[in-house]
Design a protein with these regions (language model features):
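Conserved active-site-proximal phosphate/metal-binding subdomains
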Residues: 2-25, 29, 33-44, 54-186
Length: 186
């Protein structure tokens, strides 16, 4: 997964690393194939590229580098055949690359999503939330969906919201409360 292009939780440890060239497909795919080859398992493990793949040309490019296939997220999520809520599809389909924002999620990972009303409001108060971070005795939402959660565990620097609530709102098509993960293109 290319962290500069993918949506959702990104394949880098810090937001500052999202544009690092060490993640470029032109480097990662050949290096990964070389590792698989050296381990003698290149035939057993297909290398699948993901992040920012939107066209036939994108697929051809990563396959020419040695990828066995690709993973498409947003392009399939918004198809007519998909069973997602129509508003969920509309938000993803109509969002432009400049509508995306990067932030640290409750899992402590860089993430990319559409700058919805909820996400904009959260980011405006994030510094205040970080200033009062503290561990809770239990999950206040009663989900305990993550092994480590910035909100429940009081982890400074990690997101301070219930990701389960926000993702569920997005799936219901609730633009005002939803967290809509989405990638960008090149």
């Amino acid at each position: 997964e290319h962290p500069r292009l993918a949506g959702g939780h990104l394949g880098a440890a810090k937001i500052a690393d999202l544009n690092d060239s060490r993640f470029d497909f032109e480097r990662v795919i050949p290096e990964s194939l070389a590792f698989l080859r050296s381990a003698g398992i290149e035939k057993e493990i297909p290398l699948i590229a993901a992040g920012g793949i939107r066209s036939h040309a994108d697929i051809q490019r990563v396959q020419s580098l040695g990828a066995a296939g690709v993973q498409l997220g947003t392009p399939f999520a918004v198809t007519e055949e998909g069973d997602a809520h129509p508003e969920f599809k509309r938000v993803l389909a109509e969002a432009r690359d400049e509508d995306m924002v990067e932030f640290t999620s409750v899992a402590g990972l860089p993430a990319r999503a559409v700058a919805t009303p909820w996400l904009k409001a959260y980011l405006k108060i994030e510094d205040r939330l970080q200033a009062v971070v503290h561990a809770k005795n239990r999950c206040t939402k009663a989900f305990d969906c993550l092994a480590q959660c910035g909100l429940r565990d009081g982890l400074a620097g990690w997101g301070q919201f219930c990701i389960d609530n926000q993702l569920a709102a997005a799936l219901r098509g609730d633009l005002k409360k939803g967290l809509f993960f989405r990638g960008v293109g090149e």
